Amino acid sequence: MPKVKRSRKPPPDGWELVEPTLDELDQKMREAETEPHEGKRKVESLWPIFRLHHQRSRYIFDLFYKRKAISRELYKYCIRGGYADKNLIAKWKKQGYENLCCLRCIQTRDTNFGTNCICRVPKGKLEVGRIIECTHCGCRGCSG
């Protein structure tokens, strides 16, 4: 998360309410980045980072679109400041993508057969009792 440069322009009203949560998530992100990865698969070491990125973006999304607790100015400030992923939030606004875990799961160019990730398959269409985990972010099913 980028440092807030307060010398240029003060943050919008309501920043004091959002800042402690974003600082806490930033601290967790730093811990996840420095966490040792011995004993984990190569892809598993990035999963906590993807989860925290999702959590931070979802927090801003919920405050603005669901609870309407922050102003548009503060929302745009958070997007411009890198506190939330604007592309992920744009997908959450579309039908069928409300619970999307990360953008890598819907990119078809990263797969051999040009398909989406396994976590995008509805649970009703999977085998009963089969536990799935996305190789990109560790999601266990974000399609519903």
Swiss-Prot record:
It is found in: Nucleus. Keywords: mRNA processing, mRNA splicing, Nucleus, Spliceosome. One of its GO terms (cellular component) is spliceosomal complex. InterPro entries: BUD31, BUD31/G10-rel_CS. Its main location: nucleus. GO terms for biological process: mRNA splicing, via spliceosome. A motif (Nuclear localization signal) lies at residues 2-10. It holds the Pfam family BUD31. PROSITE patterns: G10_1, G10_2. Belongs to the BUD31 (G10) family. Involved in pre-mRNA splicing process. Identified in the spliceosome C complex. PANTHER family: PROTEIN BUD31 HOMOLOG (PTHR19411:SF0), PROTEIN BUD31-RELATED (PTHR19411). This is Protein BUD31 homolog. It comes from Danio rerio.
